[in-house]
Amino acid sequence: MDKKLLDKIKIKSLKIIRLPEGDIMHVLKKSELKNWNFNEAYFSKIKFNKIKAWKYHLKMTLNLTVPQGKVKFVFYSAKDSRFKVIKLGEGHYARLTVPPKIWFGFKGISKHESIILNLSNATHDPKEILRCKKNDIKFNW
């Protein structure tokens, strides 16, 4: 089941409209909301070479974009010790949809602070999050 779950992580390329005054970066259209309930949007920041790991959401589906900087996301399947790595941000602007019940962490890989936007189907609830220490899951960041 875990192996199939990692394969359910989806990447959707997003449109950037380049303008001399500053870019317009698409995130989500109303028509894309028909299959899930939007409940909360929030930003997370990550500094260069810093790592935030590991988290496991019991119920929340994540919809992640990186409008500033660049971030390496790492997803882990405990069943077969398999990892999936996806980089988002500068050079690869996309939305990453992550179903619940997947261990994940991320690292800032841009020289300046990166910003992650999460559009989730649930409001923040510390009771639906499992955490473990960075070294509990062995990954060479």
Where are these regions (language model features)?
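Non-catalytic, conserved peripheral segments adjacent to functional cores
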Residues: M1-R95, I109-W141
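Glycine-centered loop/turn positions within well-structured domains
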Residues: F104
